[in-house]
Amino acid sequence: MIREPQKSAKAASKSSAPRARSSVAKATSTKATSSKAASSKAAPSKAGADAGAAKPRTKGLGKGVIAVAQPSFRRERALIKRGVWPVAGCDEAGRGPLAGPVVAAAVVLDPKRVPKGLDDSKRLTADRREELFEEICATAQVAVAYASPERINRDNILRASLWALTRAVHALPDLPQHVFVDGRDRLATRCESEAVVGGDGLIASIAAASIIAKVSRDRLMCRLAQECPGYGFESHKGYGVPEHLAALARLGPTVHHRRFFAPVAAAWRKIEGVPAEQTGVTGDLFETPVDAGIAATL
């Protein structure tokens, strides 16, 4: 009699176990469902947060175009704060063409009147370069020097370029205490020289010099176009474009061409032995000023 209630209690316990497990399973299922619902609700807010995150400003840029920071006056100011003044930047234009001089420029910017929009001349339009050229000349110390094609033929393009850069620095009204030069090579100047690779895109003074050199050379090539018609100097500025190569083959080279550059050398071989006056050659516009050591100060 005593054992029967125990059995029934045990049976009751066994019968209640499935219900307990069932309720636990339901609770787990309900918890999982609510968790999924919560996560599905949270997902849109996360996506919204990502969508609202700050993105690089690309206004005005085409698809796939990377924004490039403009050169700054920061490194010049750091030197000025240490008492180093004047600080110049220098650069050249025209190392790659088949004809015309290398033109070098040196610029000392006024710390209080640094033109806005300075940049590597290659990243500017021709009209913008002209505008900045006038502004730089009106507010800064500027000097320009030329290395003629004859000097390039004699010394090679690198040495002629460094020579012109050095001349430009020494032609400044006030000799700088420090000069930044674009490229890998320091200059043999009477002041401290610092080479900066890609400097025309980093340092404002070099960017200004690149603009002065580019505009000065472009103007000179337009003058050469009048002296040597038919070569198209006014459009390609002496670079080896198809139009220029065709003119070389048709008219032959002038003394403004760099004799040891391959396309020019080939053109000379075709007319070897022909006197210069029979090839349409005229005098070198830059030979006298360069050999006389004159660097024009604008």
Curated annotation (Swiss-Prot):
Disordered: annotated segments: 1-57
Q: Where is the RNase H type-2 domain?
A: 85-273
Compartmental location: Cytoplasm
Where mainly found? cytoplasm
Compositional bias per record (Low complexity), positions renumbered to this chain: 8-55
Keyword Nuclease recorded: yes
Q: What is this protein called?
A: Ribonuclease HII
**Gene designation per UniProt:** rnhB
